[in-house]
């Protein structure tokens, strides 16, 4: 069993630390919330007066904090982790922070001779309690291999996202998609109500289409990702259908700002001559808008 320092005992961190204890690991904990520390001490953890004390003699130091500034302060501030850290220890940041902050933290740790990787998590606090988190590991092959037994005490699935900083990048993309889709789903649900359409009917239909399953696994693989833009569903038709939905929403006084923004992207694609291409070619349009080179010839 490993000697672990766990810093950050919030809604996610506390149950994650508890699962490490249940697996028999030696845990030294620190948090500014004394009650959160007491909760873990009652389960067998050892309290630390500061991050440096928590890190002393630890093989792994796990940080699970609300933002990147706090992570930096915990690592490099007064009585920070670096003051008590041994050079053979591995720091694992599991916080959700800005990727560029992660890159700088890892670089600064390396400059001091320390090892650090990023492993943000997916799923919810309920999964943190049951030890079924999705673990998104960004690190060297050696770091991922070394950390895996510790990480799997807190999760049920580990994805090796690639090198250092890649874990937080895939977490960022996943969060962007799920959070934006939550708002777009709300627009669709409210339009459903305004049209007096039974919600269960809409759910039944969408659960079997790209609307419910997402384009990454439905419309894209056999089209734009395979270099094929021949239309299964033309951008011109998608633009028309989206326009009808927005017109109906406007008549019913249902605000749909995300839908309107989406239609603008389709309008740009049509203006670029993509109207008769498959709707998955929207990926190429957004690439070009981002200053990148399209991967599929028009």
UniProtKB/Swiss-Prot annotation:
Q: Quote the InterPro entries the UniProt record gives.
A: 3-OH-isobutyrate_DH-rel_CS, 6-PGluconate_DH-like_C_sf, 6PGD_dom2, 6PGDH_NADP-bd, HIBADH-like_NADP-bd, HIBADH-related, NAD(P)-bd_dom_sf, SLA_reductase
Say which enzyme class the record assigns: oxidoreductase
- What Gene Ontology cellular component terms go with this record? protein-containing complex
Q: Report activity regulation.
A: Inhibited by the NADH analogs tetrahydro-NADH and hexahydro-NADH.
Q: What is the effect of changing residue 123 to G?
A: 130-fold decrease in catalytic efficiency with SLA as substrate. 3-fold decrease in catalytic efficiency with NADH as substrate
Signal sequence, start to end = none
Q: What turns on this gene?
A: Induced during growth with sulfoquinovose.
Is NAD there in the keyword field? yes
Which catalysed reactions does the entry list for this protein? (2S)-3-sulfopropanediol + NAD(+) = (2S)-3-sulfolactaldehyde + NADH + H(+); 4-hydroxybutanoate + NAD(+) = succinate semialdehyde + NADH + H(+)
Keyword field? NAD, Oxidoreductase
Q: What is its EC number?
A: 1.1.1.373, 1.1.1.61
> What start-end ranges are recorded for coiled-coil regions in this protein?
none
Binding-site list for NAD(+): 11-12, 31, 65, 96, 240
What happens without the gene?
Deletion mutant displays reduced tolerance to the cytotoxic effects of exogenous addition of succinic semialdehyde.
Q: Per its UniProt record, what Pfam families does this chain match?
A: NAD_binding_11, NAD_binding_2
Give the residues annotated as active site: 171
Annotated residues for binding of 2,3-dihydroxypropane-1-sulfonate? 123, 174-178
Instruction: Kindly state a single biological-process term from the GO annotations of this entry.
Output: toxin catabolic process
Q: Cite a single GO MF annotation.
A: oxidoreductase activity, acting on the CH-OH group of donors, NAD or NADP as acceptor
What this chain does, per the record? Reduces 3-sulfolactaldehyde (SLA) to 2,3-dihydroxypropane 1-sulfonate (DHPS). Metabolite profiling studies showed that the enzyme also catalyzes in vitro the NADH-dependent reduction of succinic semialdehyde (SSA) to 4-hydroxybutyrate (GHB), and that it could be involved in the metabolism of SSA, and other potentially toxic intermediates that may accumulate under stress conditions. However, the enzyme exhibits a 42,000-fold greater catalytic efficiency for the reduction of SLA over SSA. Shows no detectable activity on the analogous glycolytic intermediate glyceraldehyde-3-phosphate.
Q: How does it assemble?
A: Homotetramer. Dimer of dimers.
Q: Which family does it belong to?
A: Belongs to the HIBADH-related family. 3-sulfolactaldehyde reductase subfamily.
Protein name from the UniProt record: 3-sulfolactaldehyde reductase
The organism's lineage? Bacteria, Pseudomonadati, Pseudomonadota, Gammaproteobacteria, Enterobacterales
């Amino acid at each position: 069993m490993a000697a672990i320092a766990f810093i950050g005992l919030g809604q996610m961190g506390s149950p994650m630390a508890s699962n490490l204890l249940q697996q028999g690991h030696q845990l030294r904990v620190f948090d500014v919330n004394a009650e959160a520390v007491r909760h873990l001490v009652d389960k067998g953890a050892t309290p630390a007066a500061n991050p440096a004390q928590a890190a002393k003699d630890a093989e792994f130091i796990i940080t699970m904090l609300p933002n990147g500034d706090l992570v930096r302060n915990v690592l490099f501030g007064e009585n920070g982790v670096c003051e008590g850290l041994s050079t053979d220890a591995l720091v694992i940041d599991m916080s959700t922070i800005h990727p560029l902050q992660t890159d700088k933290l890892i670089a600064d740790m390396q400059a001091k001779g320390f090892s650090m990787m990023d492993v943000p998590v997916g799923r919810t606090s309920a999964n943190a309690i049951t030890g079924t988190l999705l673990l998104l590991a960004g690190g060297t092959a050696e770091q991922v291999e070394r950390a895996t037994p510790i990480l799997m005490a807190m999760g049920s699935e580990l994805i090796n996202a690639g090198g250092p900083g890649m874990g937080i990048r895939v977490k960022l993309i996943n969060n962007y998609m799920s959070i934006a889709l939550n708002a777009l789903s709300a627009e669709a649900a409210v339009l459903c109500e305004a049209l007096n359409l039974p919600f269960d009917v809409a759910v039944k239909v969408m659960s079997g289409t790209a609307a419910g399953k997402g384009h990454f696994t439905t419309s894209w693989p056999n089209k734009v990702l395979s270099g094929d833009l021949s239309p299964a569903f033309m951008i011109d038709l998608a633009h028309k259908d989206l326009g009808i939905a927005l017109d109906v929403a406007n008549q019913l006084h249902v605000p749909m700002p995300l839908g309107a923004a989406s239609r603008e992207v389709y309008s740009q694609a049509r203006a670029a001559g993509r109207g008769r291409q498959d709707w998955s070619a929207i990926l190429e349009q957004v690439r070009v808008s981002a200053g990148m080179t399209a991967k599929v010839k028009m």
